Amino acid sequence: MDTPPMPSLLWHKPGVAIDANIQTFLAADDVLLDREFFLYDITASTAHAQALQRIGLLTPDELDNILRELQHLTDEYRNGTFLLDTQYEDGHSAIESRLTERLGETGRKIHTGRSRNDQILVATRLWLKDRLTQLSTLNRDIAHHALQRAAAEQHLPMPGYTHLQRAVVSSAGMWWAGWAESFIDNAVRAADTHALIDCNPLGTAAGYGVNLPLDRPHTTAALGFARLQVNPICAQLSRGKFELAALEALGSATLDLRRIAWDLSLFTTSEFAFITLPPEYSTGSSIMPNKRNPDVIELMRATHASVAAARTEIEQLLSLPSGYHRDLQNSKGAIVRGFKRGLAALELLPALLSRLQWRPDTLRAAIDPGMYATDAAIEAAIAGIPFRDAYQMAAKTADTAAQGRTPETSLTARRSPGAAADLCLETLRARWHTLTQPTSDPDPR
């Protein structure tokens, strides 16, 4: 079915009919996804208008009028007066349509020297910078809570497991310190990824530049980018690749979230009974009155699947030659879904970590005699017996290895750096304090 073109179709050619089904397929849910990026798009349009005025393509009065209308559009979008919906093909066309509606010919100048390609590149780049800043902050917060608990509970004995089998005497402090260091690593990765993508693609147009002396250094500074993304072809190559890098940084954190949630899921079972969760982190059963289910940590555990799925979707989209291809439109939905689920789950973790309670008696009772066998083997090796012989001796006497030993003496003896008697918390704290917190301009929302 052919229908008259929407006024917001920037690419429409006179005399060419628009098939409604094809247009629906092309647009998909693009305009709805652009609600995530719309205010960033307006911010970039402001910088672009300033750059046009600096090379004489807008008069000072025209610039003032455009900036005023862009601010009005921002205000109306925030308060719900302006609705970005399917009457527009996408957020870019909505901005140009509004400026044209309010300013006539002046509004029609806003797209001079830019393409929707670099327009969405810069909007998503600003969006990703903010999300990576949030991710870095969350990683730092999680590490901070874990460090606090490591210091408070470094002498609390608990079983250490390999293969989900009891292995050696460990401590709650060591468990906490392990997560602290891992989330410090995650914060570093988020900051490094922020630095990678902190470059300005605006002004690269459709991927080959334009025959205008665009003031790209101005837009770089105005938008708070650390540097210019120089080559237009590289700018197009970075679409999807930078989104993939951001999701990998997020996935590093949600992978650890999945594993700590696994630990907590096990530790809350009656078979382990190592911890007690705050009541608001569990729900009841619809049929079994006796049940309290750890649904929150189970859904935390499941979050990484959503992030990994988003990453895989973008990776598959990138099976492309150089230059822009419409396939890349689908990368927007992937990053929105991935970051929405990932950040929401990570936001719940600091409070949970600060409030869960260990059950010391149960922890101690789970330490069986065989868990001292490694200590016995190493002590024999220190006394001069070759370790492999000491190992065999300790294996034969594992059932009685606890004689003369306590969990505390085992922990005290583990003096290798990072082990229970020397958690190196000051080293971890120093590393935490030197984390580079990425900065972004205030979120335009």
Curated annotation (Swiss-Prot):
Keywords: Amino-acid biosynthesis, Arginine biosynthesis, Cytoplasm, Lyase. Its EC number is 4.3.2.1. Signal peptide: none annotated. GO terms for biological process: arginine biosynthetic process via ornithine; L-arginine biosynthetic process. Belongs to the lyase 1 family. Argininosuccinate lyase subfamily. It comes from the Bacteria. It catalyses: 2-(N(omega)-L-arginino)succinate = fumarate + L-arginine. Pathway: Amino-acid biosynthesis; L-arginine biosynthesis; L-arginine from L-ornithine and carbamoyl phosphate: step 3/3. The keyword Nucleotidyltransferase does not apply. The keyword rRNA processing does not apply. It is found in: Cytoplasm. This is Argininosuccinate lyase. It comes from Xylella fastidiosa (strain 9a5c). GO terms for cellular component: cytosol. Pfam families: Lyase_1.
